[in-house]
């Protein structure tokens, strides 16, 4: 090779490597409180993946770079808001029949914004998603209360199709969690014996806590829970705990699904039972607010 061409080829080759490395780095969304972080990333094809909810992380890049060593066509990607469609085999957060009868929904990233609200203790992140084939948009709202270590979330579903669509499932939140074990604590009861405490070690498969009793729900099944991570016994003095509560007085459902990779996917929101909702063209639907907190103390 001509000596004058060698530096040129070397420069071009190194440039391609650098460009490829830069392109491979995912866009990171890190929602933070004083003591916790909720970390997501955007893949090269626009999927928004969920990576972490736990202790605060200031540099989230290493978390998003952890490889799962499993094929994406297994249908178990940790999507930030799962849908019925594509290769998702988990219980979906959103299930829709579109105006043309199609039931496939695949959401992709459009943009996201983060701003501080009037109360400087509070920041709000909005992630905008759109369907790959239909005129359907979803906005995910995350509001972080720094001092309280609380993050609330809800979804807004917007119909830009020419006709009405039907919402079959419209959960407020989809939260994938990875640990060795999961101990679920929740409350149940009846008249004169409300707020009984129940502890359940989650195994592979699904467990649901739900109510179909309309406005008189919480004295039988309460729309709140705690998940103790990496422990098979409940202790009030130590351990990692994720707690959640749904700000909704009607029919609700909390679904806990542990898959074959030992990932726990938590769905929380209004109960989809007998709740099909027709959303007209140009209309939007806002889900109830889901409240999360994390503690390791």
Please give the residue ranges for each predicted region:
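Boundary at the C-terminal end of the N-terminal hydrophobic targeting segment
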Residues: 20-24
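Bacterial N-terminal signal peptides that target proteins for export
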Residues: 1-9
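Short, Lys/Arg- and Gly-enriched loop/turn segments at beta-strand edges
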Residues: 293-297
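Polysaccharide-binding surfaces and accessory modules of carbohydrate-active proteins
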Residues: 25-39, 47-257, 273
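Short, structured beta-strand/loop micro-motifs enriched in basic residues and often containing a Trp
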Residues: 261-271
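Bacterial N-terminal signal peptides
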Residues: 10-18
